Amino acid sequence: MEQQNIEITEHICTGHAETTLAARASQAYSREFLSHCTLYTTAEPCAMCAGAIYWANIGRVVYGMPERRLLQLTGSNEQNPTFNLPCREVFARGQRNIEVIGPIPEVEEEAAAVHAGYWN
């Protein structure tokens, strides 16, 4: 299953790729199945997306660049008012373990390139 950000294109304030994918996956698959799934994403999930991943029961998240790098790319763009709240901290407050792998320095530049021009 793949998903792109639809926040700007469809004017949905919660339309981050991870949130939308978590919603679609929770409709298509059982919670048990999703607990064995991995969500791959270019940037560290924001607090909202981390919550959606948690509620969908997705078992693992892999991301290329930290959220603070995304903030550097977006600057003060009102479409992305970033929290300074790592997804690991969000998941740590939950009642089940979600494995987090990232950031991955070897792919950080490639992950950042996906966002080039999107937020401007």
Residue ranges of predicted features:
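A short acidic, helix-capping loop that chelates divalent metal ions and anchors anionic groups
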Residues: 7-11, 72
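Short HxH-centered metal-ligating active-site micro-motif
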Residues: 13-48
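Zinc-dependent deaminase
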Residues: 52-120
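RNase H-like nuclease fold core
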Residues: 1-7
